[in-house]
């Protein structure tokens, strides 16, 4: 008889421009069984972003109503916009034994860690601060003032690396994805995640 295991919660975050979204997209393409949680936000869509696929784009009024209804696992205000993780999708999939990936900001990740200390928390770092600035500028979606604001915030966010279980440098997307896949495999083999399994095997041998 197989033992049903709780799904693994994988939280991926890092400063703006570190490449979290690109990494998560490539990870999901390689690991078809992973469930990517879609965040809600009040910011405007960037070029090519689709509502319900990249984000659930909400008005500030809609977002605040969701807060009142306790619909979020976590939420935070970042760069003058609200971001949040809808609760129902995450909890349902974890309970069903599915592994769930959250791509969220650092504020949100730390809130999730308080509720799910057993989760796997991965911090994505750029290869250098110069490269980070170039990536933010290349997006072409922010004014010079916003770029400076994001860059300063990113520098401060590096102080939170020690709150995470793992750090992955995104100097190459494929290499970063392979490191995250290795982390997931290792986490699934941890003794404290397999107690029921080895106890069952031990009982069968008695």
Curated annotation (Swiss-Prot):
Q: What class of enzyme is it?
A: transferase
Domain (Guanylate kinase-like): residue spans on this chain: 7-185
Keywords in UniProt for this one? Answer: ATP-binding, Cytoplasm, Kinase, Nucleotide-binding, Transferase
Query: What is the annotated localization of this protein?
Result: Cytoplasm
| EC code | 2.7.4.8
Report if keyword ATP-binding is assigned: yes
Gene Ontology terms, cellular component aspect? cytosol
Q: What is its main location?
A: cytoplasm
- State the superkingdom: Bacteria
User: What GO MF annotations does this protein's record show?
Assistant: ATP binding; guanylate kinase activity
Q: Would I find Transferase among this entry's keywords?
A: yes
Catalytic activity as recorded in UniProt: GMP + ATP = GDP + ADP
What Pfam families does the database record attribute to this sequence? Guanylate_kin (PF00625)
Which residues does the annotation say bind ATP?
14-21
Give the record's family classification: Belongs to the guanylate kinase family.
Q: What does this protein do?
A: Essential for recycling GMP and indirectly, cGMP.
What's the protein here called?
Guanylate kinase
- According to its UniProt entry, this protein's organism is Caldanaerobacter subterraneus subsp. tengcongensis (strain DSM 15242 / JCM 11007 / NBRC 100824 / MB4) (Thermoanaerobacter tengcongensis)
